[in-house]
Each structure stands twice: as C-alpha cells, then as structure tokens.
C-alpha cells in the first residue's frame, strides 16, 4: 500500500511528515539508488523548484540524498514544472525532480519525479521507491559520491522551447495581456516570453517572497487578474499557478474560462486542421458534460480518466492522443511537452486570438456548461468517511434525486485531506439538493 506518494508525488505541510528534511534526504537516497540500478546511464539528475521558502531546505536535502548514492545533481533553480520534464530529456538525465506543491499555499510543499523520457514516474516505480525509503539503501563509496552544480540558463532554454511550439512567425503585436504568475516559478519567464512576442504586458504576481505563492493570485484566485484586465483595458488575462503547469484565461470583460473551455477551443481547431491525433480529447471525470456534448456535435471523441494529469498523460500515451487536460487548467499538448504546461497552453490561446481576429470573450465560450456544483469536506488523518454506511446511503439517495438527469461524483483528493463532492444537473434545485445531502452526511461521519 502506498503511503508516501499521492496522485502527484509526495506532498504535505513543510516540516510535517512526510515533508521533512530528513524524509527528503531518505527519498533522495532511495530514488538515487533506484535510478543507479535501473538506468545504467550517466547517473545525472536535474532538480527544479518553485518559489516557496521551504524549497531551499528540500533542494539541499534531496541533493544530499541523491549525491550520497553517486548521482550527479544539476540545480535548475526556480523553473516551471514542465521545464523539468524538458530539461531531463534535453540534458540526457536519468531523473528529473520538481520541488513544488503546485497550486497549494506556501506552507505546503511536494516532490515529484520525472523519468529519463521526461514523463512522470509510473505507479510501480513509485511503489518500489517507497519500499527502498522504508528499508534504506546502500550508499556510494567516498570516491563515487556525486557532484553538484548549478545550471544558469534553464529558464531561457525552456522559454525557447515554449515559443517553438507556436506557429512560425506568430507575433502578439497590439495585444494587451495581463499575466498573473502567482508569485511562483514563472514570475520572470512568462512576462519575458510575452514581451519577446510583442505583447503589451501587464505582469502581476511577480514579486515572490517565499510566503506569498498562490496567495490571492494565480489560477486558483482569478479574481485578481480579472480586476486587472478590466482596470487596464486589457484584451485578455492569463493566470498561472505556482509551478505554472495550470492556466486559466480571463476575457476582456473579466469573465473566467477554465480548462474545459480552453481544451474545447484547441480540440475543435486541431480537428479542423487534421492534427488532432486519435480523433479525441483526453480529459478527466471532472470535465463538464457540456464539453462532452460540444465535442460530440463535432465528431470528436472524449476519453475520460481518473483525476490527475498523470492519468491523462498515461491515457494519451496508451491511445496515441496528442491533446488532453483537466478542468482545473492542466493542458497537455504532447507534440511539444510531456506534462501540463500552463504558459504554453495560454500562448496557444493567444495564438488563436491573433489567427481568428476574435475577442477573447468569443473564444472562451465554446460551449454552455451544464450547471456543476463542487463542495469539499476536510477530514483528519486516519479517517475514512466514505466507508460509513450513512454516507453510502446518502450517495444512493442523491443518485435517486438526480434520477438520470445528471451525474454525481464523490472522490477522495489525491493531494489534500479532502472529500470532493461534485454533481452536474440542468435542474439547479436538484443539483443543490443532491450535493448538500452528501456533504452533510460526510461532515457528520467526520465528526462522529
């Protein structure tokens, strides 16, 4: 049974198990030994991080663990998560590591790993690494300890890769863009790329202090960017999260468009151009029913997966699809990247604005969403509220309330101690009734 790894690596509150310096040291040694055993390659690892205060602590602890098993460590500094996947392949490394808790607040942090192909590790690999963390590993002899050095141009190399994914010669002249970098990993890279492409850039969320990542800004708080778009008379807003693997778009009126709308736009365009591989989009069970209907009307399939961009990527690789993502804003374009890339997806949206000549408000409403309601219930460590008979009964009753006119989804979050209760239904009264009844039952089970 997996105890350390969730749906996106290891994550938790800094200085609380499992996110302690001691555990990071042990994880570094275990993953180093695993790749010394498996890769038989250059024994090289790249490490990136976002702007959290605890990132320095975990960077040093992981580096020590990795070097102790003979891995040579290349430190990239603050870079977006997709840059780590890129640099792992570009530098022919055996392993890539990103230190980030993505959209979570500053007190949290996490560690996620990429294999030599730039893709996240498999469940099987993570389970084996967990076993090695528990049992301990053999360290390298003194003369075989790994070397450590910094790589100064990682963000520039990433920026060039992002720009190369766009239509050759594309420029954003005349486009006024608010870009919210969430005080995170892309706080320098995103404004620079937009400026290089000719946009009139209004940067916000670009003053990280180690504690303000995702605080009142970024993709999980688009209100800040929405207000900035309206105040500056901008044409569009691009909101990233702390590690820049998510994107949310704001139109010129201040309206927010999630990942479903962005995926709908890109899928329809790619299908029209004959470059949507497999004739389908890959998305998770959280994507809106309206997206499914929109795609179906255009002869485009929808492949649904469990929640988590890693499962989207796995299905894309299995089925030969090249476009996928999540409602939360992870957009995966596998022709250009191995994981969700918020900045790249945002730039492709801007490219569609320039190509079509349409305002952002026209492009962000590709379909009318079916009313959707999502509520979360927090639980304590060791609790299993979904196993309670009262909760199971409430779920059955809620499904009866919807009676085939909508859908109900209840799941445990893979990154936080939350039970997520989501439903969709055209009848908003039934929708609210169904969700609230389950939320109440789960909350009662937590308090029991």
From Swiss-Prot:
Molecular-function annotations in GO: magnesium ion binding; phosphoglucosamine mutase activity; phosphomannomutase activity
Enzyme Commission designation: 5.4.2.10
Keyword Isomerase set for record: yes
Any one annotated GO CC term: cytosol
NCBIfam families: glmM, PRK10887.1
InterPro entries found in the cross-reference section: A-D-PHexomutase_a/b/a-I, A-D-PHexomutase_a/b/a-I/II/III, A-D-PHexomutase_a/b/a-II, A-D-PHexomutase_a/b/a-III, A-D-PHexomutase_C, A-D-PHexomutase_C_sf, Alpha-D-phosphohexomutase_SF, GlmM_bact
Disulfide bonds: none
Residues that hold Mg(2+) according to the record: 102, 241, 243, 245
Post-translational modification: Activated by phosphorylation.
Cofactor(s) required for function per UniProt: Mg(2+)
Gene Ontology biological-process annotations: carbohydrate metabolic process; peptidoglycan biosynthetic process; UDP-N-acetylglucosamine biosynthetic process
Domain of life: Bacteria
Presence of keyword Magnesium: yes
Pfam families: PGM_PMM_I, PGM_PMM_II, PGM_PMM_III, PGM_PMM_IV
Reported function: Catalyzes the conversion of glucosamine-6-phosphate to glucosamine-1-phosphate.
Catalytic activity field: alpha-D-glucosamine 1-phosphate = D-glucosamine 6-phosphate
Family statement: Belongs to the phosphohexose mutase family.
Name this polypeptide is given: Phosphoglucosamine mutase
Catalytic residues of the enzyme: 102 (phosphoserine intermediate)
Native source organism of the sequence: Ruegeria pomeroyi (strain ATCC 700808 / DSM 15171 / DSS-3)
Cofactor binding notes: Binds 1 Mg(2+) ion per subunit.
Residues annotated with Phosphoserine modification: 102
Keyword list, A-Z: Isomerase, Magnesium, Metal-binding, Phosphoprotein
């Amino acid at each position: 049974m997996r105890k350390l790894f969730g749906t996106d690596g290891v994550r938790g509150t800094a200085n609380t198990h499992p996110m302690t310096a001691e555990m990071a040291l042990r994880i570094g040694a275990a993953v180093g030994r695993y790749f010394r055993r498996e890769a038989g390659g250059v024994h090289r690892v790249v490490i990136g991080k976002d702007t959290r205060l605890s990132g320095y602590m975990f960077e040093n602890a992981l580096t020590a663990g990795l070097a102790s098993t003979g891995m040579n460590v290349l430190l990239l500094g603050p870079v977006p998560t997709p840059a780590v996947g890129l640099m792992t392949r570009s530098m022919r490394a055996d392993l890539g590591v990103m230190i980030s808790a993505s959209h979570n607040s500053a007190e949290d942090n996490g560690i996620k790993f990429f294999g030599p192909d730039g893709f996240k590790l498999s469940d099987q690999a993570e389970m084996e690494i967990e076993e090695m963390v528990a049992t301990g590993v053999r360290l390298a002899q003194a003369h075989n300890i790994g070397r450590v050095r910094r790589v100064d141009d990682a963000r520039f190399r990433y920026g060039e890769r992002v720009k190369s994914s766009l239509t050759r010669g594309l420029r954003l002249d005349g486009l006024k863009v608010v870009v919210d970098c969430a005080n995170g990993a892309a706080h320098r890279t995103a404004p620079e790329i937009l400026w290089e492409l000719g946009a009139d850039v209004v940067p916000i969320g670009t003053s990280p202090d180690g504690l303000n990542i995702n605080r009142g800004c970024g993709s999980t708080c688009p209100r800040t960017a929405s207000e900035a778009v309206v105040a500056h008379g901008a044409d569009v807003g691009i909101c990233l999260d702390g590690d820049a693997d998510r994107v949310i778009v704001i139109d010129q009126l201040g309206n927010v468009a999630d990942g479903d709308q962005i995926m709908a736009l890109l899928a329809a365009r790619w299908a029209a151009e004959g470059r949507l591989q497999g004739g389908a989009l890959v998305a998770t069970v959280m994507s809106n029913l309206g997206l499914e209907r929109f795609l179906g009307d255009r002869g485009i399939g929808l492949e649904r997966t469990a929640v988590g961009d890693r499962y989207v990527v796995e299905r894309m690789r299995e089925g030969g699809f090249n476009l996928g993502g999540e409602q939360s804003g992870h957009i995966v374009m596998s022709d250009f990247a191995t994981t969700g890339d918020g900045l790249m997806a945002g730039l492709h949206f801007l490219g569609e604005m320039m190509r079509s000549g349409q305002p952002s408000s026209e492009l962000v409403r590709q379909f009318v969403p079916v009313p959707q309601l999502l509520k979360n219930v927090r639980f304590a460590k060791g609790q299993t509220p979904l196993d309670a008979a009262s909760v199971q009964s409430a779920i059955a009753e809620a499904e009866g309330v919807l009676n085939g006119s909508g859908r109900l989804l209840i799941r445990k979050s893979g990154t936080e101690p939350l039970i997520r209760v989501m439903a969709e239904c055209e009848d908003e009264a039934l929708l609210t009734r169904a969700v609230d009844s389950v939320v109440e039952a789960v909350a009662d089970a937590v308090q029991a």
